[in-house]
A protein has these predicted regions:
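Conserved N-terminal subdomain of the carbohydrate kinase-like
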Residues: 1-51
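Glycine-rich, flexible loop/turn motifs
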Residues: 8-11, 21, 77-78, 151, ...
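Conserved beta-strand segments that form the floor/walls of ligand-binding pockets within enzyme
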Residues: 24-26, 43, 72, 103, ...
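Short gly/ser/thr-rich secondary-structure transition/capping motifs
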Residues: 24-30, 81-87, 115, 195-196
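Conserved beta-alpha-beta core of the PfkB/ribokinase-like small-molecule kinase fold
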Residues: 41-124, 130, 139-142, 147
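Conserved phosphate-binding/catalytic region of the ribokinase-like
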Residues: 114-211
């Protein structure tokens, strides 16, 4: 450790018999100053957006950075920290409206919108602003929607033994973001325009990479 370093947030994960995790959090964070001229893509998510005082700082940073960079977001609901859906939904939807890419799990959607289907939520979210929205569905794979292509894309799963699900959503997001970056569909304002005009043939390889 370092005597001079700031405290960082810690998540303690406890696994059940199926490998699903329950978390306890020890939170402490602030957003460092970022030079927007050196950023082409910014990703954020979960409690970083919804928990204060850092949450407001994150939203302010997203608003600044998106003037020249693409933005991705994973709401990654944590009810034990976030409280009720009503307490965080307006902030989550605010950030969704600033994004190019949004990914959430079916569990996230069920918590945030208990009376809506996955398709209804994805269509609602594209109306807020993002070009590509994706819902991961565990053993059922993923469902995706492009804002200007009203046909849902179903991406099948890969059958593998599951030891635990810790980091599964983050791994999916990392694969998808890196896949879109590698083909120029994320990473700066020109990439934003390319993503907006992309069809499924351009986007699908990144989704398979994420799976």
């Amino acid at each position: 450790g370092s005597d001079g370093a700031e405290r960082t947030s810690v998540a303690h994960a406890t696994l059940d018999a199926q490998g699903k995790a329950r978390y306890q959090f020890d939170l402490s964070y602030s957003v460092p100053r970022i030079d927007p001229t050196v950023v082409d893509h910014l990703h954020t998510g979960s409690i970083a957006v919804t928990v204060e005082p850092g949450g407001s700082q994150v939203v302010s940073t997203v608003r600044q950075i998106r003037q020249r960079a693409t933005i991705s977001y994973d709401p990654n609901a944590r009810p034990t920290i976030m409280g009720s859906p009503a307490a965080v939904l307006s902030r989550i939807e605010e950030v969704i409206g600033l994004c190019d890419l949004v990914k959430a799990s079916d569990e996230d959607l069920a918590w945030l919108y208990p009376d809506a289907t996955v398709e209804e939520v994805l269509r609602y979210w594209t109306g807020l602003g993002p070009t590509l929205v994706v819902c991961t569905r565990g053993p059922a794979g993923a469902t995706a929607l492009l804002r200007d292509n009203r046909e849902l894309l179903q991406v099948g799963p890969i059958d593998v033994p599951v030891a635990d699900t810790v980091g599964a959503g983050d791994s999916f997001m990392a694969g998808m973001v890196s896949g879109l970056l590698s083909v120029g569909l994320l990473g700066g304002l020109e990439a934003r325009q390319r993503l907006r005009s992309a069809d499924w043939s351009a986007v699908q390889p990144a989704l398979h990479r994420a799976i």
